[in-house]
Amino acid sequence: MFHYTYNQEEIEIKEQISQQDVTYHIVVKSESMRSRVKEVRRYFEGNKDYTDVLFFSREDGSFEVIVRLNMIESFLIHAFRFKCLQSISWE
């Protein structure tokens, strides 16, 4: 599986794994991080597979992101690419 780190002063991430997907509950703590999360969202909303990664914005400003199991690696790599994550490792 994957292990990742992030700046806890800027973002909080909790994940919930099911048999078909992983749901990430993301609380953004800075406007610069909010912009980076939106870049990840734009990337996945702009590709041709509309069900690979689904973003939902919550009223409190947090995000719920549902990622198909076969897309977790891609999601984490792009979160790292847009500097939402500090590191990723495979275990």
Predicted stretch roles:
Residues 2-4, 28-49:
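Short amphipathic alpha-helix segments
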Residues 53-91:
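Short, compact, well-ordered microdomains
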Residues 13-31:
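Short glycine-/aliphatic-rich beta-strand segments at the starts of folded cytosolic domains
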Residues 11, 19-22, 81-87:
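Inter-domain helical "communication" segments and dimerization helices
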Residues 11, 31-33, 72-74:
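Generic "edge-of-domain/loop-turn" microfeature
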Residues 12-18, 48-58:
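Short, flexible, solvent-exposed loop/turn segments with mixed acidic/basic and small polar residues
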Residues 1-16:
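Short, charged/polar N-terminal "headpieces" of proteins
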